[in-house]
Amino acid sequence: MQRAFLMTCLMIFSSSVLASDQRQALWNRLEHATYIQTGSGKTVIYDFFDPNCLYCAKAFQLERPIADKGQLTVRCVPVGFLTDSSFDRAAAILQARNPREAMENNFMALLRTGHAVISSATATEATHSALRRNERIFIDTGATTLPELVYRLPGGQVKSFRGELSTEQLGLLISGHGLDS
């Protein structure tokens, strides 16, 4: 019994050490993900989104004014798995002449009507690979739902936040504080 307890403690301690290294590796992979950037602020967040996700649209609506003011850099990482049309809609956004505009228009319509408006598109081989790579990175965050934010604190610690973000939480993030998931 005592040995099992010690082994459990060792596994927990070891996984927390690995988790830090894994999170840094995750950040490095995110820097090479396919994303749509808004803003140019000092604080950088990676925001995974699905074109059919209402909560993702709400997160974008909250982040956009702060990004537009230059206080935040949001790297919107498309994934496509919530519904049958998600993957093809994510492909349509990435393959649009202006992906940022396509994403914004889709999110605004989703907020207004509750439905995504971007038409589905058949993914090119490059887009298909990019979306699958983004999905693998998303899975590696440990998340099972959207939105999922990944950010780095001023000291270099990589953290993630799952769920709907409040204005207050976004303010904390911009000021260099971590968030509780």
Question: What are the residue ranges of the model-derived segments?
Answer:
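Extracytoplasmic thiol/disulfide redox context detector
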Residues: 6-85, 122-145, 163-181
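Positively charged n-region of N-terminal signal peptides that target proteins for export
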Residues: 1-4
